[in-house]
Amino acid sequence: MSKMEKRKDVRWSKVFLAAVTTAVLVIAGCSSHSGTNKDSSSTAYGTTANAVTQPANNTGDDNKSITVAIAADPGIDQLDAGAYKGSMNVHAMIYDGLVEYGEKGEILPALAESWEISEDGKVYTFHLRKGVKFSDGTDLNAAAVKFSFERWIKDPANSLNIATAMQSLEAVDDLTIRMTFNKAYYPFLTELSFARPVRIISPSAVEPAGDPNGTFVKAIGTGAWMAESYKTDQEAVLVRNPYYWGEKPKLSKIILKVIPDPQSRVLALQNGSVDLAGGQLGKIPVESLPVLQKDSTLSVQEAPGTNSHFLAFNGNNPVLQDVKVRQAINLAINKKSIVQDLMGGIGKEAKGLFPQTVPYVTEDNSTWYGFEPEQAKALLAKAGYSDTDGDGIVDKAGVPLTLNFVLQESEFPEWKSIGELIQSELKDIGINVKLQVLEPNAYYDTLWKTKDYDLIIYRTYDDAYNPHAFLLSLFHKTGDAPAVVWSDAKLEALIDKAVGTTDLKERQSAYDNIFKKMYQEAMFAAVYFPDDIFVVNNRVKNFKLGYTTFTPVFWNQLDVGE
């Protein structure tokens, strides 16, 4: 029998945001957590033999476990807290941050039980929780936090934007860490809740131990879980961290089973070889949901998401530098048909880059192009295109308008059918589209490195990453490198204004102008706002969706029963 659970909109706490402008902000309290070269051999991980005595309060049944389907190898051997390697979901299970993201987007205590922010927003002082240990039994202290931050800040490839503004990092005493910046940056606390690269790793996790420049050896965090074993491209086994400071997991073990093929994940759910699948862990094909909903052993959980799927344009292509062509592509896409006919009514038509579950996105600034194919044809004509040879494809100076459309389906199985529909719709207005389906690694190389595409379907980030982190990552230059999706100096100036002001009204105004400019210049093609779908075996008890995509499930609460 199918059960539908709706998650509340994830939004910023306006009270918290306004408080950033006050002289001092103190938040205190206790918060339970909710949460390379490879070979095919099995590798053992976990607490070492010479670790200190296991604590007595490690409660739970040592025989309780579940198996979770994941779409890609979790990369346990690369799971450095200070790097963008391995599974983001597993990062969040093994490592804790100083703070965590709450149900309504509020920032809650985690490893830091309280903190203060200076009046000018440039100095943050964090007070660490007492008695916290890493999974190897060593103590969490300010030196370990300093080590962790120095590890990711030193590497531009792994660093967040705020790293360039950090002037000093000081361990004031054993449980106090102070960070000083050369400018105010409102999203800093939110970024500290990210799964990576800001979470805290034990100094003994690298060689030589305690060296920020040391080589990563093993994932040692303060989180509720630690890696016990790992077989590349097959599975990873996570077990309870016996030293965990928060709510003790009810399960003793979580097995992450790598199943790249979406239909194979469906079969594994049906035959009981996996207990849970879905979301960013490993998408469930929409066309399989009716069958799964009728399965009496399974439950389907649905939640409104905070991301969107969209088409990125390659601005290096002279054809796509013409705003009329970009607008025509937008007007040719029937977003209602995508949601109703392809997605089975799951999700919503996109009205911009972000849904209104994202902070600063409002009804007023959510304006986008409708389905107007005749208007699209007229815009192509204004851009100088016509079908001179009667083959149904428009051309200009004898050159047909042909675009290469790149996608992948391992992580997002619906993208292939969406791509085929858009291909057909663009042909209807005279654009020839060639689809290219790539494996995930090749796909991401194409997006981030080679840019060997004209159109590529991608998704925004989720939850705490929106809107600022996604805009900085994809629509803003990094150093001398141009923006990944679309380069525009005026847009970048607006993004800088949004993230640099501590005034809430100024920030909202900056975001309004960002979204307006994106619409006017059709910097991308909006497609749809997906819902998150999970399928769970009914033997799994206490299932509850998490507040972020990197913690999609409250793992510590899960239990099993007959």
What do the PLM-derived regions correspond to, one by one?
Residues E116, N161-V206:
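Surface-exposed binding/hinge segments that line
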Residues E106, F194-P249, K253, P373-E374, ...:
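Gly/Pro-rich hinge or "lid" segments in bacterial periplasmic/extracellular proteins
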Residues A18, L25, K231, E235, ...:
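Detector for C-terminal structural segments
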Residues L169, E228-P242, I255-N317, K324-A328, ...:
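Extracellular/periplasmic solute-recognition and catalytic clefts
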Residues M1-S65, E106-P109, N161, S168, ...:
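Short, low-complexity disordered leader/linker segments with a strong preference
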Residues A69-E119, E150, I220, T549:
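N-terminal lobe/hinge region of extracytoplasmic solute-binding protein
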Residues E113-D155, R178, V319:
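Aromatic- and charge-enriched surface segment that lines or borders ligand/interaction sites
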